[in-house]
Amino acid sequence: MTPFFEQLSNILFLDIETASATESFAELDPRLQPEWIRKERLIRRESVLEPGELFFDRAGIHAEFGKVICVGVGFFQAKKKEKKHLFRSKVFAQEEEKETLLELKTLLEKKKWILCAHNGKEFDFPYLCRRMLIQGISLPEPLQLAGKKP
């Protein structure tokens, strides 16, 4: 196999799906409500909106007010004898976000993965890091991105 195909087995493709942490602004922890209102002022286009009106639609894209509901991953597995690659995929989706993140962490610690995601550097990776830290989970090596370049 060529070096390209050997390296292909080290790439973990991933995508996360997120949602607001609560169904409505009213259910949000009272300590976080003023923070959401501040955030909402930055994204609000019309000043006539009521506080919390954008919560359901927008909270999921902000790690402080959202949660990871599932993580889809995929990777190529080399079959050297047959000289081919199989693509394997898996979805992590548990009732509790912490369990989903712990399962992902276990996979990330199994080998030295190179992470690949659409807009991963700007969204998926920072979101996962923030949610892991909020849940009290230490960051696995592939998500320790400080100082790394694409």
Task: Describe the residue ranges of each PLM region.
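Entry/capping segment at the start of metal-dependent catalytic domains
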Residues: 1-66
